[in-house]
């Protein structure tokens, strides 16, 4: 009988080509699949909630894989310990669930939350430098917050979708777009029902133009109406972005907020 294993994963994306397998570069998916196949001696595909780009991090990526009955995959707690003992230091399994239910890490997700971290210092502190972007320009956070309001809700985000991709629809819903300031760091919190390719980084790039005074806050409304990515600002760099968490309906809602209180985290 085949069982389904669900993983919640954190990783530092600096050394990887992103989540998805690449023929000439190391990916998070390749590391996990190679390890699982060595353990099970069976070809295993690991499917994630979303494909993070090269250099992008995750605190709460969710993925699943199917495997036949195997003694090493019988207990979720042991799976977690085994994988964490064998994975490199920049990939950590935070939680494991075993289920036979109809769950899909991508299609069962109801919301995703990304965090993009900005440093207000001209040179980020050493322990932050791999996880934040410094625009090296004074930012008006109030203007950025005012601009962010225009993007909350259901809109056609074609102006924020990178070219070269085909989409059945560019309409998405943003439930929240907030800026949280803590000392010299600003976190852009973006929560929605789904995201287009590089959409979050393109939104941050547009907010930075507003913060620098290049455009008024209303410019983001104009961008929405034009539906033209060619007139948009450059994307923010990948290393400031992190997939913070993915939410699912019951019984998988423990992947949502307050995830740090999960009992599995301590095991």
Swiss-Prot record:
Active site: 53 (nucleophile)
Entry keyword Isomerase: yes
Gene3D superfamilies: Pseudouridine synthase I, catalytic domain, C-terminal subdomain, Pseudouridine synthase I, catalytic domain, N-terminal subdomain
GO biological process, one term: tRNA pseudouridine synthesis
Enzyme class: isomerase
GO molecular function list: RNA binding; tRNA pseudouridine(38-40) synthase activity
Disulphide-bonded residues: none
Entry EC number(s): 5.4.99.12
NCBIfam families assigned: hisT_truA (TIGR00071)
Similarity comment: Belongs to the tRNA pseudouridine synthase TruA family.
Assembly and binders: Homodimer.
Function in brief: Formation of pseudouridine at positions 38, 39 and 40 in the anticodon stem and loop of transfer RNAs.
Descriptive protein name: tRNA pseudouridine synthase A
Organism this protein belongs to: Chlamydia muridarum (strain MoPn / Nigg)
Taxon lineage: Bacteria, Pseudomonadati, Chlamydiota, Chlamydiia, Chlamydiales
Gene: truA
């Amino acid at each position: 009988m085949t069982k389904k294993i669900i993983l919640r994963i954190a990783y530092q994306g600096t050394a990887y080509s992103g989540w998805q397998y690449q023929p000439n570069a190391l990916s998070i998916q390749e590391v996990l699949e190679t390890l699982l196949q060595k353990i099970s001696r069976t070809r295993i595909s690991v499917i994630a909630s979303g494909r993070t780009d090269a250099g992008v991090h995750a605190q709460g990526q969710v993925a699943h894989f199917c495997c036949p009955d195997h003694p090493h995959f019988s207990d979720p707690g042991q799976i977690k310990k085994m994988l964490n003992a064998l994975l490199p230091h920049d990939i950590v399994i935070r939680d494991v669930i075993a289920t036979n239910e109809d769950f899909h890490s991508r299609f069962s997700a109801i919301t995703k939350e990304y965090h993009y971290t900005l440093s207000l210092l001209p040179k980020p502190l050493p322990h932050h430098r791999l996880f934040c972007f410094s625009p090296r320009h004074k930012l008006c956070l109030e203007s950025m917050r005012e601009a962010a309001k225009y993007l909350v809700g259901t809109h056609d985000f074609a102006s924020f979708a990178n070219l070269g991709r085909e989409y059945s629809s560019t309409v998405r819903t943003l439930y929240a777009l907030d800026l949280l300031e803590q000392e010299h760091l600003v976190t852009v919190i973006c929560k929605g029902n789904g995201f287009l390719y590089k959409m979050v980084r393109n939104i941050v790039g547009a907010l930075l133009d507003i913060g620098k005074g290049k455009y008024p806050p209303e410019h983001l409304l104009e961008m929405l109406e034009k539906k033209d990515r060619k007139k948009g600002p450059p994307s923010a760099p990948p290393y400031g972005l992190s997939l913070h968490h993915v939410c699912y309906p019951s019984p998988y809602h423990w992947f949502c907020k307050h995830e740090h209180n999960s009992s599995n985290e301590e095991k």
